[in-house]
Amino acid sequence: MTTQSIILLAVFLLVLLVLAYPLGTYLAKVGGTAPIRGLGWLARFEQFLYRMAGSNAQTEMSWKGYAIALLVFNVLGTFFVYAVQRMQAWLPLNPQAFGNVSPDSSFNTAVSFVANTNWQGYGGESTMSYLTQMLALSGQNFFSAATGIAVIYALIRGFSHRSVKSIGNFWVDLTRSTLYVLLPLSVIVAVVLMSQGVIQNFSSYKDVALIDPITYQQPKVGTDGQPVVDDKGAPVLETLTAKTQTIAMGPVASQEAIKMLGTNGGGFFNANSAHPYENPTAFSNLVEMLAIFLIPAALCFTFGRMVGDMRQGWAILGAMTLLFVVLTAVVMGAEQQAHPGLAALGVDQGASLMQAGGNMEGKETRFGISASTLFAAVTTAASCGAVNAMHDSFTPLGGMIPTVLMQLGEVVFGGVGTGLYGMLVFAILAVFIAGLMIGRTPEYLGKKIQAYEMKMASLVILVTPCLVLLGTAIAVVLDPGKAGILNPGAHGFSEVLYAFTSAANNNGSAFAGLSANTPFYNVMLAIAMWFGRFAVIVPVLAIAGSLAAKKRLEVNAGTMPTHGPLFIALLVGTVLLVGVLNYVPALALGPVVEHLQLFK
């Protein structure tokens, strides 16, 4: 690591802490039912929405009722996003006259945005109209994030409630999370981004003349905006000569704000946050990284306030930060190192006043290695998936760390709501292991952890590894899966592993060398995204319901403290052992082998 990397990481974490603490207090109020001081006008609008929807905000739900409402809402959202894409050509706000999106790509995209994954097999500026981007995709950026916040509110109530059968009202949690948190923060972040040069307009695309014509090859695109493939599934290339360049326009800033705050990650442009119209300056880059971590970090303090012990929130935040700092240091160091192949040729790759040094392939010069690697660590730790550099161009070890951050279960800060409830499931597992070692019935926050909670926690922990490993195995065995692998050997395997890791853990970033916009990958990855999201949420809600029905025991001399360094170490160890061990053989076949091949 360079001095610049260390300072950048330290400043980022310090600013994050300063912003997250007061937001966490505010989020605890949003998670309650009482009006918030100074926002009476918004409370009246909230009540108006309930009346319009015919919903009784005072009705509490059991965990099953909560889960059913959540699933119905998200299934309807999936159908809506799919329908908008399939009818795009006949809808307004389509100045480029884009055609309807293909059925398999529409299905993949609908599931992706509803599941808070935002995996994109398409290029946004060449496929989606302004209406599709704003109404369907940006709308789900809000709703999927609000769903995650609702689930963590329900789980926290499971710990704080005593001997009740309810865990809250899904419609209230969804509405309040959107009105009081996501919308106001998005307006603020969008204005800041516009001040840095992020565009916000409804203009048609601009054609500008090039100084010199350029001849190039690219995959041929059909009338539906999807690549044309031959009988073997390989893309058909066409040779083109360009005399002008088309510069895409659009309402970018409004989508960029919620894309980051909601840990969604789906870019308006194909280049995502590497595009200068999405992320033009070093300051906008810092703002976007802070936006990704802001709500996940704040929810740790929300957790502490709602359970009545701020030390619990600090302990969870400490475990997350420890894992994040260590893994970020590794990826920064890996990308700053000289490439052995170039070193053998005598190429100077050292950092100096004249050059960044290290591996600059796939990185924007306006960001450099430090800001690019920190962004990569942030976006994969937080299940966001936005990128300001191409992860496929990272070194083998540099690319492995983002993969590992996702494979930990997206609990290192994680997504909005999802990161904290994932880490709390690991905390339940940690106290269970500790209870076995000392021969006591395990407790967490005064609630006994018994067989039912452990069964549900086991489901939460095992669902995603099964989806990742099974999906990867199928893809590298079947011909349609192998047809999308453009890079042979270990790196090609890493691309497939990364794709299913990203999909099942609801991240959405990719090793872009994989041709994933095919019926095979669109369907397979959609399945991984759907079950990676909702097959985890339902057991979490079951845990919440079970805990809420239990009495809260008083602390005594035999109670294991869950707020000190010992518990943090136990929690980190549990995350590493359970999270990483599932994937060691797969990682050995991919990035580890590729790293060793550098020294041949």
UniProtKB/Swiss-Prot annotation:
One of its GO terms (cellular component) is plasma membrane. It is found in: Cell inner membrane. Keywords: Cell inner membrane, Cell membrane, Ion transport, Membrane, Potassium, Potassium transport, Transmembrane, Transmembrane helix, Transport. GO terms for molecular function: P-type potassium transmembrane transporter activity; potassium ion binding. The keyword Transmembrane helix applies. Its main location: membrane. Pfam families: KdpA. The chain crosses the membrane at residues 6-26, 65-85, 136-156, 179-199, 283-303, 314-334, 367-387, 419-439, 458-478, 523-543, 566-586. It comes from the Bacteria. It is a multi-pass membrane protein. Belongs to the KdpA family. HAMAP family: KdpA (MF_00275). Part of the high-affinity ATP-driven potassium transport (or Kdp) system, which catalyzes the hydrolysis of ATP coupled with the electrogenic transport of potassium into the cytoplasm. This subunit binds the periplasmic potassium ions and delivers the ions to the membrane domain of KdpB through an intramembrane tunnel. The system is composed of three essential subunits: KdpA, KdpB and KdpC. NCBIfam families: kdpA. PANTHER family: POTASSIUM-TRANSPORTING ATPASE A CHAIN, POTASSIUM-TRANSPORTING ATPASE POTASSIUM-BINDING SUBUNIT. This is Potassium-transporting ATPase potassium-binding subunit. It comes from Janthinobacterium sp. (strain Marseille) (Minibacterium massiliensis).
